[in-house]
Amino acid sequence: MKNTIKYFGVLALSLGLLGSCETVDFGNENLNPNQPSKASTAALLTSALRSLPSHVSEVNGNMWVQYISQVTYTEESRYSTTQWSYDGWYSGGLKDLQEIIDLNTLDAVAYSGGGTSANQIAVAKILKAYYFQFMTDTWGMVPFNEALLGVDNITPAFDTQEAIYTAGFSLLDEALSSMNNSGTLNGDILFNGDMSKWAKFANTLKLTMAMRIADANESLAKTKYTEAITGAIGSVSENIEYPYLSEDTNDNPWQDRFETREDYALSDIRSNRMDIFLFSQCRFFIGVSSGP
């Protein structure tokens, strides 16, 4: 009984102390500086550009058509990863690009740190078109219209290549008509914010896509080709080259694969026909100087 009385006494005292406390404002003391509450659109663009060459130069396609074969880790050579082969495209660069579009559309002023909002959206649309064009050329039907919605739709419908190409042309047209050449763009590790180069990128992609569909939709192909040809890349000096760096985290992934590792080897199918690949065209160059 005495213990019970003591217990209730301590409880009452504790509640009294709690009730007498004032709310203390700790300011930013409990905020994690390493976990920003808002995404930086400049950082999102850098991330999307950083992941792009890793995707488009992915080694899996070379194994699936048996140009090369795995030596140590053999999952891809045995086709055991094909069911998730494009997951990283959606959860990585494409999600970053969609976030740039959404943030600048909903709250343009708050995200002006990434540059002129129109340019952020335009570049995100150009890269989004590039991503999806590459994906549908690789895998055929993939989710597009219902993709990138996160938990709001975890089972997006697959779209046809025709629908994706049509949407891609629209993205490029919207980007070209809205970009501001006198505006700014931050986080751009490809062209350093030069919007004239982004316009050439968009027109060159548009030209490429038009040529891709020439046999499927000749009329649309001609229209888009005509629209893009004068604004596309016109010389080798204008080639678009991703600026790989020297450190391991940002160097060319193919260098890592072959410089010090032995993960891949030339497949028998390729090596057995090597004489055909190497020498079938030599007759056209016999006696011709290679020049300086």
Language-model segments: which ranges?
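Bacterial N-terminal signal peptides that target proteins for export
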Residues: M1-G9
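Bacterial Sec-type N-terminal signal peptides, specifically the leucine/valine-rich hydrophobic h-region
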Residues: L17-L18
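Membrane-proximal, proline-rich intrinsically disordered regions
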Residues: C21-W84, G88-S91, E99, T105-V109
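Conserved, well-structured interaction surfaces
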Residues: Q70-G187
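TPR/TPR-like alpha-solenoid repeats
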Residues: Y131, T138, M209-A210, A216
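Extended ligand-binding clefts on enzyme/binding-domain cores
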Residues: E227-P292
